[in-house]
Swiss-Prot record:
Full protein name: Large ribosomal subunit protein uL6
Organism: Glaesserella parasuis serovar 5 (strain SH0165)
Subunit architecture: Part of the 50S ribosomal subunit.
Function: This protein binds to the 23S rRNA, and is important in its secondary structure. It is located near the subunit interface in the base of the L7/L12 stalk, and near the tRNA binding site of the peptidyltransferase center.
UniProt GO cellular component terms: cytosolic large ribosomal subunit
Length: 177
């Protein structure tokens, strides 16, 4: 059995868990998330804990049990605390601002880049060079942050571009004569 799957997921007070066949729904103060659990995984919900066990005789059942446990743990954390991603814009003239549910980015192109945030993700710009994204869905917020970063990835010579707040960009040395 996977080491990750051996640890049960504790369900805090104020969080409702509904298990309908292989469909697991978690509801909390930050919203509601649901996920289909793989058929090779047996899920049990009792005494405010969720346990995951691989079904016998199925290939990769151990791995699926560990994956399911990690995903459900992220769902529980998401509906209680939520997830935050911070992006920084580095470069002369690089700016961001919120227009309703859309992030307007000036990234040195001849046009402004408008990125609409999907339902379940909220954004704010405390300064012109900073974007803060918040969501209950860890996968969704990571994808949105990656999409925004992909407009102008940090380049290796000056480090200009959109980067995660905790990202370290390795700077290359310029060519010598």
């Amino acid at each position: 059995m996977s080491r990750v799957a051996k640890a049960p997921v504790a369900v805090p007070a104020g969080v409702q868990v509904t298990l309908n066949g292989q469909l697991l729904t978690v509801k909390g103060k930050n919203g509601e998330l649901s996920r289909e659990i793989h058929n090779a995984v047996e899920v049990k919900y009792e005494a405010d804990t969720l346990t995951f066990a691989p079904k016998a005789g199925i290939v990769n059942a151990d791995a699926q049990a560990g994956t399911a446990r990690a995903l459900v743990n992220a769902m529980v954390i998401g509906v209680t605390e939520g997830f935050t991603k911070k992006l920084q814009l580095v470069g002369v003239g690089y700016r961001a601002q919120m227009k309703g549910n859309t992030v307007a980015l000036n990234l040195g192109f001849s046009h402004s880049v408008e990125h609409e945030l999907p339902a379940g993700v909220t954004g704010e710009c405390p300064s012109q060079t900073e974007i803060i994204l918040k969501s209950a869905d860890k996968q969704l917020i990571g994808q949105v942050a990656a999409d925004i970063r992909a407009y102008r990835k940090p380049e290796p010579y000056k480090g200009k571009g959109v980067r995660y707040a905790d990202e370290v960009v390795r700077i290359k040395e310029a060519k010598k004569k």
